[in-house]
């Protein structure tokens, strides 16, 4: 990797660490969202660097939908034990009681109940006034126009037409009681940046990002992995073993794999250098209606 590229990644690293430290100093009760994916892994690594050799001074929060890949949950618990950070796990109790499922209730309702409402419950329960997220501007058009410090009102809603100006590296974190800020330290990173940084820093990731033979079914133009016996097959669907990996991770019935032979980090980086589509194309929740992601973000989704 050439020196110019290394310098670019160091600049991104420095910017993100600056943002993380600013939030820790400025807010009374911040939290870092931990979705277990590649961006969360990078953000956690940056937080550890920001306060090394001390402990991360805020907890991590995982909003568990009960439908994540098994390997994600295993990785989450293993990582928490390895680094000893304070991990909070929240499941929407109403959603669990009603048996909320992407198969029964559909992607939109499942996401709203288990992710959006679950997140708002957790933020209210613990009284967090700032929440870090790993979203990047290159992922999706509604995220492209969101600020690094993204203001949320008392109902956790976002108004894209009423965002605060951000001049250079000056961020406005003033909030009234009950209001909060969503903070995105990786805003200026790209998917390629993330993978090159993971490679350079030897950051652990969920094995699902690497190609392997996995059982999948083709549904709505996506390859859905059969992760457990709750998978409901539709008429005519056949489970096949294919060499696939995931560019993005979420609830397994709503996350599409891509056919790939990239079973190493260098292989993934080589794929990223020629990729022409966003990783979010593999997320069913982004396509369940027009303007889907922006609508979800307005309602309180990350």
From Swiss-Prot:
Pathway assigned to this chain's UniProt record: Sulfur metabolism; hydrogen sulfide biosynthesis; sulfite from sulfate: step 1/3
A Pfam family it matches: PAPS_reduct
Molecular functions per Gene Ontology: ATP binding; sulfate adenylyltransferase (ATP) activity
CDD domains named in the record: Sulfate_adenylyltransferase_2
InterPro entries named among the record's database cross-references: PAPS_reduct_dom (IPR002500), Rossmann-like_a/b/a_fold (IPR014729), SO4_adenylTrfase_ssu (IPR011784), Sulfate_adenylyltrnsfr_sub2 (IPR050128)
Region (Disordered): 280-302
GO terms for biological process, alphabetical: hydrogen sulfide biosynthetic process; sulfate assimilation
Top EC category: transferase
Stored Gene3D superfamilies: HUPs
Substrates-to-products reaction catalysed: sulfate + ATP + H(+) = adenosine 5'-phosphosulfate + diphosphate
EC number: 2.7.7.4
Keywords associated with the record: ATP-binding, Nucleotide-binding, Nucleotidyltransferase, Transferase
Family: Belongs to the PAPS reductase family. CysD subfamily.
The protein's role, per its UniProt record: With CysN forms the ATP sulfurylase (ATPS) that catalyzes the adenylation of sulfate producing adenosine 5'-phosphosulfate (APS) and diphosphate, the first enzymatic step in sulfur assimilation pathway. APS synthesis involves the formation of a high-energy phosphoric-sulfuric acid anhydride bond driven by GTP hydrolysis by CysN coupled to ATP hydrolysis by CysD.
Alphabetical list of HAMAP family matching this protein: Sulf_adenylyltr_sub2
Subunit architecture: Heterodimer composed of CysD, the smaller subunit, and CysN.
Protein name stated in the entry: Sulfate adenylyltransferase subunit 2
